Amino acid sequence: SFYYGVMWNKLYRAEVWKLLHYPEGRLHEDDFVAHRLFWRCDKVVCLPDVLYNYRLRSGSIMRTSLKPGAFDAVDGLADRYRFYVENGADRSVIDSAYAACWRRYLFLCAKVRQNPEPQLVKAISKEQFLMQGLISYLPNCRHMKMTEKLSAARWAMMPAESLCPAK
């Protein structure tokens, strides 16, 4: 099953990219595209060889402090969950995508709580609307523990300002 992946370390046939584009102005753009691309593939081959090297550079989204755009990843993962539901994916794939979306959201909320800057708290408030739209599936997800489900419900429903009080 595929519910997490990056695009940079793979080779593709050109035809699987037809009509697929990265969203403009969004961070974590792989989260919006990877599932759609792999859904189109008839066959995926994995090699044990190291053919790519990853370069760490200052200024990349992986090496900078938390910014409101980090919540784009949650939007992409929510899109992935909805895509799998709409296309009749296996229940395990749907549950994995759903859990990945909530876990990313909860991780970012915890990071904001450590450093509740106003623009980050505002980003949580904006994202809560999206997460509230996903909450109805929460009791059915088999890939989340009860403690995660309770935390998800709390972070989706309570005002961000009360969850992340200013220092």
Predicted regions and their residues:
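A cytosolic small-molecule/anion-sensing beta-strand core signal
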Residues: P48
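Membrane-interface aromatic/basic loop that binds lipid-linked glycans or pyrophosphate carriers
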Residues: Q114-K167
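Structural motif
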Residues: A89-A99, T147-L150
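Donor-binding/catalytic cores of nucleotide-activated saccharide
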Residues: S1-V45, G59-S65
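A diffuse structural propensity rather than consistent per-protein peaks
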Residues: R13, K67, H143-K145
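Amphipathic alpha-helical repeat scaffolds of TPR domains
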Residues: S96-L108
